[in-house]
Amino acid sequence: MKKRISTIANLVQSFNPKLVYDIGCDHSYLTSYLIKTNQNLTIVNSDISKNALLSNYQKFKNNNNIHFFVSDGFNNLPELNINPKIGVIAGLGGLKIINIISQKENFINRFVIQPQSNLIELRSFLSLNSWDIVNETLVQDREFIYPILVIEKLKKPFKLTKELVILGPKLINFKDKHCLMKHYQCLLRVYQPKQKPSLMDLKIIETLNKIITSYESS
């Protein structure tokens, strides 16, 4: 978990934000990491669990720059007049991330996101709804490989090809090919067992098999 959190924090810090919204903050590990390097950073932590937030509040109650809100996504979040701002949604399923960034209350145009599932469906949504994937990386933490994306809202639509939706427009040039292939193999195991695969499922299986086979024979 430490490597995953540190990677997310480094991506957040690369934009030099003054305000961070950690949506679905869970135990506020990201807040703990961020304030070590920037005590002046304003951080809004939100979660649907009141009990989790109460526990987190006790850790940070003496820091006036750290705030806590019980909220399902943006439903109960205030838009603070501090810029630049960035949102983080980490450790939630891809479909839940889609739900959150689609909310009409969403006022953030840049996010670091780390989906636990439905990565390809998430990329497809981003492509169809004018969100640009400006960065994507993989982090291996113990036996798990986590995809982490930086996305920004575009003014004009920009659609990815099906192949790039499946493979990731930034991941195809990922330097650690062994880690990348392990990631693709994990994705393949999600789609292969389906009894009634859709046309998109079949395209995903074909594309992943093709690139994995190419890597293994090289």
From Swiss-Prot:
Its main location: cytoplasm. It holds the Pfam family TrmK. One of its GO terms (biological process) is methylation. This is Putative tRNA methyltransferase MG248. The keyword Transferase applies. Its EC number is 2.1.1.-. One of its GO terms (molecular function) is tRNA (adenine(22)-N1)-methyltransferase activity. It is found in: Cytoplasm. It comes from the Bacteria. Belongs to the TrmK family. Keywords: Cytoplasm, Methyltransferase, S-adenosyl-L-methionine, Transferase, tRNA processing. PANTHER family: TRNA (ADENINE(22)-N(1))-METHYLTRANSFERASE. One of its GO terms (cellular component) is cytoplasm. It comes from Mycoplasma genitalium (strain ATCC 33530 / DSM 19775 / NCTC 10195 / G37). The keyword Transmembrane helix does not apply.
